[in-house]
Amino acid sequence: MSTTGTPKTTAEIQQDWDTNPRWKGVTRNFTAQQVSDLQGTVVEEATLARRGSEILWDLVNNEDYINSLGALTGNQAVQQIRAGLQAIYLSGWQVAGDANLSGHTYPDQSLYPANSVPSVVRRINNALLRADEIAKIEGDTSVKNWVAPIVADAEAGFGGALNAYELQKAMIVAGAAGVHWEDQLASEKKCGHLGGKVLIPTQQHIRTLTSARLASDVADVPSVIIARTDAEAATLITSDVDERDREFLDGTRTAEGFFGVKNGIEPCIARAKAYAPYADLIWMETGVPDLEVAKKFSESVRSEFPDQLLAYNWSPSFNWKAHLDDATIAKFQKELGAMGFKFQFITLAGFHSLNYGMFDLAHGYAREGMTAFVDLQEREFKAAEERGFTAIKHQREVGAGYFDRIATTVDPNTSTAALKGSTEEGQFH
């Protein structure tokens, strides 16, 4: 009888927690026995999530920093890895705007179906796996790791602790390496750069983080759990139940019954310290790019948790040139990395790249006709020659040659291979 999928024993789980450096500083509000009880007799192998989690953890611990771009589609992710990035970021904002399962365009307010982000994680992984297959049959070794780790946005969890557990589970099945969770009220969730944000009590967000960790442990995957706080800008909180939040109450109440709170860096620091035992990385959402604010946050958190890793959002919601000069922009990432901000990302890079790229082409095409597209094609040829761009050969890029290989493996005498005799073979050398 096969032993594949047999879960670890309670003793083996506990030994891993006690001896594996991966779990240094991690607090669990549950026992190894409770994890074992929840596993059943078979645990599905989550190869992509496990592999991605291990790679991501290695990167953020051993590189100066990892910079990432938000991908909106599978092909965008492929281009990012082809160009030299080592990790993919997937934002809920972009999924809301153009990639959710309801097929609608939404603002970043958790209006889309909760399984939409896992669906896009799976799509991106499928695209990366195909790129890896194509590269292998072509003998292309220029990319070290095609199936790069994906950090995905769980927003505010779409509900309570059980919703968070199920969403983390879905992220793992889809192959996410890391997942971030924000401390907003899910039913009133807003983009970090919109108004009207409502915080949940510190203890409630710890419950969310605990649910995510439990789901990962039950799946036997070392998922990278990221805690985000929106306390820098939020002006409301649902309850005064947690004494850690009370010093920031401003004495006001709203028509909905929410409590007014004083925002800023101090509540962010307080929350980050509370989340640190439960999170592998911590992200403070900010309204402007400011090295001094980042330094204060890092020094305050790491004075108590010296090994705590941090994350930073290079948000397109900032007008970068209005805040920083070119020299500061050029050194910003390196200096953040030295402060412990090991995962740095541009959340909406895919949205802006996709929309501006198409607008620019359409603007030229509307006025110049085919000249505009030929200009684009010539830039593609130049990028292929000088920088390793491959999508100029679009049939090859999506796997026509790979599926020809399948066809000729099945029947070496086939006369219906796709690339042979194609215009791409004839004109794109």
Curated annotation (Swiss-Prot):
Tell me which species this is from. Answer: Rhodococcoides fascians (Rhodococcus fascians)
Q: How does it assemble?
A: Homotetramer.
**Catalytic reaction(s) noted:** D-threo-isocitrate = glyoxylate + succinate
EC number per UniProt? 4.1.3.1
Q: Which cofactor does it need?
A: Mg(2+)
Q: Where is the signal peptide?
A: none
Q: In which pathway does it act?
A: Carbohydrate metabolism; glyoxylate cycle; (S)-malate from isocitrate: step 1/2
> Which positions bind substrate?
S91, G92, W93, G192, H193, R228, N313, W314, S315, P316, S317, T347
Which superkingdom heads the taxonomic lineage of this protein's source?
Answer: Bacteria
Q: Where is the active site?
A: C191 (proton acceptor)
Q: Which family does it belong to?
A: Belongs to the isocitrate lyase/PEP mutase superfamily. Isocitrate lyase family.
NCBIfam families noted in UniProt = isocit_lyase, PRK15063.1
From its record, what is one biological process in GO terms?
A: glyoxylate cycle
- List residues binding Mg(2+): D153
Protein name from the UniProt record: Isocitrate lyase
Function, as annotated = Involved in the metabolic adaptation in response to environmental changes. Catalyzes the reversible formation of succinate and glyoxylate from isocitrate, a key step of the glyoxylate cycle, which operates as an anaplerotic route for replenishing the tricarboxylic acid cycle during growth on fatty acid substrates.
Record-linked PROSITE patterns: ISOCITRATE_LYASE
Question: What gene is behind this protein?
Answer: icl
